[in-house]
Amino acid sequence: MDAQTRRRERRAEKQAQWKAANPLLVGVSAKPVNRPILSLNRKPKSRVESALNPIDLTVLAEYHKQIESNLQRIERKNQRTWYSKPGERGITCSGRQKIKGKSIPLI
């Protein structure tokens, strides 16, 4: 007998002793689930009742007012007083381009 078979026999004896001492743990390899169990505290709504009931539009109207007020605030922010408004031709350049010391007006 070589050392490997002797080791296997010793380990088999140890495993048999452990299985005899712990019969409930033999073959159990799964971990217990630690996730919380979710429960519904309220009574679930019936889909038929919710389909037949009209939709409450007051919340939607309030949301629409909120969006409009935000839009007006953004427009006021974009129309600053210190910026000049574009004329009839739109935004035109009034700068000059410098190449080799010459000043050439931008078109």
UniProtKB/Swiss-Prot annotation:
GO terms for molecular function: bacterial-type RNA polymerase core enzyme binding; DNA binding; RNA binding; RNA polymerase binding; RNA stem-loop binding; single-stranded RNA binding; transcription antitermination factor activity, RNA binding. Keywords: DNA-binding, Transcription, Transcription regulation, Transcription termination. The keyword Transmembrane helix does not apply. Disulfide bonds: none annotated. The keyword Cell inner membrane does not apply. Residues 85-107 are annotated as: Disordered. One of its GO terms (biological process) is DNA-templated transcription termination. InterPro entries: Antiterm_prot_N_Arg-rich (IPR020952). It comes from the Viruses. Plays a role as a transcriptional antitermination factor that allows the virus to initiate its lytic phase. Activates expression of the delayed viral early genes by modifying host RNA polymerase (RNAP) into a form that is resistant to termination signals. This antitermination function requires the host NusA protein which serves to stabilize the interaction between antitermination protein N and host RNA polymerase. Interacts with host nusA. This is Antitermination protein N. It comes from Escherichia phage lambda (Bacteriophage lambda). The lineage of its organism: Viruses, Duplodnaviria, Heunggongvirae, Uroviricota, Caudoviricetes.
